[in-house]
Amino acid sequence: MQIFSNKSQKLTILKEKPFKLEKEIQSLFEHNLDIIDNLIFVKSEFKIKDYRIDTLAYDTEVNAFVIIEYKRERNFSVIDQGVTYLNLMLDYQADFIVEYNESCQANLKRNQIDWSQSKIIFVSPAFTDYQKQSTNFKDLAIELWEIKRFDNDLISINPIKRSKSAPSIKQVQHTKDSALDKVTKELVVYDEDYHLNDKSDDVLELYESFKNAILTLSPELEITPKKLYVAFKQGKNNIVSIHLQNKSLKIWINAKKGNLDDPKKLTKDVSNVGHWATGDYELTVSDTKNLEYIMSLVKQVLQS
């Protein structure tokens, strides 16, 4: 992908400035985890047994740990290292909790963590076709992110998307009780089908109507299924989230209390009530009668 600078309608190609050291990438990420992916930085060079994790982070949206590894070279196995580190996390959960509490001066409890949503991210200027193919499974908790640096201090960070036809890792033969077997049993990568299964045709049709309406609001919106809801994100931020119920949809709009103009009073203030997704505004819908109006509420968040 080429990056251009635009000055007075004249485009100039910005040259890539390769990172000389992995530490440069690591430092950039660790100082900007909240901006890059809404993560909390926990520890750099976290030692566990005979291993050293480059960056340990925590995702407060899903209450799970995230391991981040940085690679400048391309001659390594993302599957082998990824599975090893994820298995390490599952085997030594207490060590991860202690490190979080000591580093973040917190009091995180074991039952507050959803270990099933743990994952590892590999960050590199480039990945080989083999590396991309070896992680192209819809339910594998290993992600590849490409990072590049250009002139004028421009940085691009692009998570590599799995193909829509990506198979399940469970279809791949592997030894029972192996590290890969344990990881695939205990970690879950949620997809849209997980939320659509066993729902009535009426609810599925209702969801499709709202989903399509939301996606037409901006080409930047992407669907990101979580354990309890389907999030529609713009970059790293949730804009709106949907939970499919038996006969209706529960919708959360990601705006702080007082920041949403809702003259029809369709939404409910949940700022002081426990709820699943992000945002202080919640509503339940069982038809498309107010679809256009609800989209006007979502649009306020997009334009804020």
List each language-model region with its residue ranges:
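Short, surface-exposed loop/helix-turn segments at secondary-structure junctions
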Residues: 254, 263-266
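Charged, terminal alpha-helix-loop-beta segments
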Residues: 1-218, 222-248, 256-258, 268-270, ...
